[in-house]
Design a protein with these regions (language model features):
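Flexible "arm" and connector segments at domain edges
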Residues: 1-51, 55-92
């Protein structure tokens, strides 16, 4: 396995973990203790931990040339466009 493959594997794992934590937060709320068990962090805290893990991998990929600031800006604009549409349709 190359270093690139290794980083891409970690990226895929972290993306899946962020998705899982995000859906738990949607289902049970951000402040609910994950799993409703004593001693567990809130869903928000666990989601933020996973997001930071993902960003750490993304920063490593940045060094490999995978991050493009222009593409990020276009994505931000696209998100804003569809956020406004969702508001117009009464979904937000």
């Amino acid at each position: 396995m190359t270093n690139e493959q290794h980083l891409l594997t970690i990226l895929a794992e972290e993306c899946a973990e962020v998705g899982q934590r995000a859906t738990k937060a949607i289902r049970f709320g951000l402040e609910d203790p994950a799993g409703a068990q004593p001693g567990f962090s809130s869903n928000k805290k666990r989601l933020l931990e996973e997001i930071n893990d993902l960003l750490a991998v993304v920063s490593l990929l940045f060094g490999e040339g995978y991050v493009n600031k222009d593409q990020q800006k276009l994505k931000h604009q696209k998100i804003e466009k569809y956020t406004q549409l969702s508001k117009k349709l009464g979904q937000l």
